[in-house]
Regions:
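Catalytic cores of histone-lysine modification enzymes
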Residues: 1-52
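C-terminal SET catalytic tail plus cysteine-rich post-SET Zn-binding segment of SAM-dependent SET-domain
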Residues: 45-133
């Protein structure tokens, strides 16, 4: 594995911290160990996030963020199951009152989430939403 290509055998190690840019293009950290991650690779999911996306990887505030508040986004904004690329289902532990309890690569298809996060999906997911209508 080098910095440009993750071998299929290494994919499971890295995929928890990757951003899907296109069907077969992911931005991944060069080191999969959590203690070595920094920046956007450390942002957790929330079903009531304070951030979303502009473009592919620019994280922006969706509302005022309080001092000390954890930065979060909804993984539905970036992750999608497509044919041979499958995002692992994840039990959600965000703890908000409207928690979905299970995060999947199909969440971007949810009409309520599409309305809630309009303008804050990655370009990749925005294009999938447009194609699905």
């Amino acid at each position: 594995m080098d910095h440009k290509h993750v071998e299929e055998s290494d994919y499971k190690t890295f995929c928890d911290h990757c951003f899907q840019i296109e069907k077969n293009f992911l931005i991944c950290p060069t080191e999969p160990r959590k203690e070595n991650l920094d920046g956007v690779f450390q942002v957790n999911h929330s079903c009531n996030p304070n951030c979303g996306f502009r473009g592919q990887v620019v994280l922006v505030a969706m509302r005022n963020i309080q001092t000390g508040e954890e930065i979060s986004y909804d993984y539905a904004m970036t992750d999608a199951n497509l044919h041979d690329v499958t995002c692992a289902d994840m039990k959600c532990l965000c703890g908000v009152s409207d928690c979905r309890r299970l995060i999947t690569g199909e969440d971007w298809k949810n009409i309520d989430l599409q309305k809630k996060y309009a303008g804050f999906f990655s370009i990749f997911i925005q294009e999938l939403i447009l194609q699905s209508h």
